[in-house]
Amino acid sequence: AVGYVAYSSATDTNGKILQINGVLPSEKTIDNNSYPLCRDYYLAYNGELTDVEQDFLTYVKSKGQDIVKQYCIQADSTTTFLSDKSEGKILIEGSTSMEPMVKALADDYQKQNPNAEIEVKATDSSRGITAVISGECDFAMSSRELKDYEAELLETKVIGKDAIAIVINEENPLENLTIKQLTGLYNGTYKNWDDLS
């Protein structure tokens, strides 16, 4: 069997992580994009932000990066943050991969700004993007790039980076897959490990 998991949670995985195109996922190979299955974590939003939404986004891109690096590779260097104490409620919906990190960001931000109330709802990236486009939420959590039409409608900020780690049984002697082989495993071109030779 072959499976996949977010690299950031791969330490909890029983199994062997494979190289893809000869590259293992690591902080270095994800940060420099040499690992082929990297992905950015985005917060997407509709145009103008309220004061509290802007304050939260400023926090995420500055002091919040301390929280981000506990979950994945930070997108920005950590800097100081002083909340303007804006009042309001923020609704965030989307990626289940991002939900624990964004909840931690929301919790820490609300300590910085007790006038803010943030609700984080895990669905999936596409549902979050649809919800922010339709005005059902203020930010979408997306662990995929936006499609062209989505990118025309929304602004995005990269808040962290991660990768998809491909995992197999530890007893399997395989060490590396090409992208073509990986695609073939998932689309049924290859039915068993011997087909990869």
Predicted regions and their residues:
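Exported/periplasmic ABC-transporter solute-binding proteins
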Residues: 1-197
